[in-house]
Amino acid sequence: MAKRVVSPNPMLSLETENIAKMGTLTADSLGSMWNVFTKCAENLENGRRLENISWRLWYREAMMSDANDACQIACQESSVPDLSSSCDSINSTVESDAGHVVDSNSFNRIDNVSVNAPIVNEVSLQAPMKGGSHSSIVRPQAKRSSSRLLSTDAFSQFISSFSPPEKPSMKDLALFHGNKSPSSKETIPKVSNSNSSDTSTDDQAYLNVSVSENEHADRSIKTHSSAPPLNQQKSSTSVNDAVSKAIQLVKSTSDLGSLSTNTSSTAQKNKSRKPTKSFSDAVAAASRAKELEKEKLSKVTVTPDDSTSIIRGFDPRLPVLSTKNVSHEEKSHSVQDDKSKQLLKPNPTQPYFYLRGSFDTGHSASSSICSAAVDSESVNSADFPHRTVYDPLPTHAIAESISQENVIEDDDDDDDAWVSVDEAESPHFTKRSPAPYLSKSFRNSALSLLLSQDEKLQHDVRSASSAALNLPRDTDIKATPNLSQSGNINSDNSDLSNYPYNDYRVYRMSHCSSNSNKVLASEISESLRRDLLWERRQKAAMNSAVLRRQSSQSSGANDDKEVRNRKVVEKGFANDCSVW
């Protein structure tokens, strides 16, 4: 019996257009489809699915018949639907061609396509009909043969491409030894022995023995065969014995060659003692590779100074950290680089400078105070020319800012002091409070900041805040520079400890920005747009109120509805007036 060839990749691929073109309702096409899909299911793309479809079509054609034809069938008839076109005998030429579908190399023979085609015998029904009524008609129960005829013409109609089968043992060995270099592998041909004579020819053809450098040290030879377990044990033992004998012969010949290298007669004797060329060359190459590897390992010396280690599975492509002696100057440079990197990296344990403090109860002291600013001694202005480093506030300024937060809690102008800073001259800070301007978008603007500053100047808010902060007597409030007029104040010349931190520092930074005019112009236009929108809403509300009033007067409603509408309009007007 021919053995079924199982390959890891599908060898046959079908085209759906060709299957659709052929007559799928004829018995001949159904028989050929069923034959190919069932016999070649493991070597086809989507073979299992096609096999299932072909079985369903075959059962439908063989066991079902039309309802009109079923009424005309006589009760005594016992026959299956007409399948004569596929059951007829085929000429000997066609049978010879069906055995070899594709003629390629010697190992590219498909045994699963060759089908022995016996003629289907006629089958009779087991239960004869008793009456002439159509209700007692029994469907024919036919025993079909497992194999049917297949011609090369029907086969070539829906086979689009064919790839030769691969030896499974070769692919598995390649996957198993994929991490090793191909130069270290040597394939040894098959060694015949009387003990392995009962193995099949197909199994011996697929037998492969791979000998690598690392496996020679342990005298372990791995064999891969597609034979059953019993035959595999016999063949492996015979091959192991043959290879061990060959290695002993090669050793003996190498010893004799080393003793008598100067004389030509001894060299000829050693050549005559050697076994066949192909086998001895393979084993000799493996032994040479083993000796080279031993020499490489002997050259490697492990000392306490050079901390090198031989690790199994070491990948030389990965970079290795060198542990050489480093001079004192290089160490100092590396320490300075590490310090500069540490200064730039954010430290989560220390609070950082915020452009505007987050006015929470838990983080009010840490966020509004520049307590974690870098010391002026450690960071020079020459090292970071593009950054503006602010000196830390003294302790009394910190206490004053904390007391100012506790005293001035009802003033909403402190919360509105959020201004965008120029990107070119950004202050030295690492993170901001989580977007405080999103909660009150119409109050946190440069325009509202200017208006609030004017209100402070008019109502003399500074005198109240200075009295609450207990400033020194010699410092006069009028001597403090007017920040609304002097916008180009240098941060290095001004002493930050003389000003309340939350009030003046942020405002001074806002006027140092170069795009303040653009920001103000855009905010004024936005405020005008909001004014127009508010007027439209008021007009719409008034029109709706007038319409409601007219409808209520026409219907004879009371005056309470007019008062109610007037209250609604006044309430909406009061809500929409809070634009600033």
UniProtKB/Swiss-Prot annotation:
Domain of life: Eukaryota
GO cellular component terms listed in the entry, alphabetical order: cytoplasm; cytosol
One example of a Gene Ontology biological process annotation: mitochondria-nucleus signaling pathway
Record Pfam families: GATA_AreA
Residue segments, region Disordered: 161-241, 256-281, 325-345, 472-495, 544-564
Composition-biased stretches (Polar residues): 223-241, 256-269, 481-495
Protein name according to UniProt: Uncharacterized protein C1420.01c
Lineage: Eukaryota, Fungi, Dikarya, Ascomycota, Taphrinomycotina
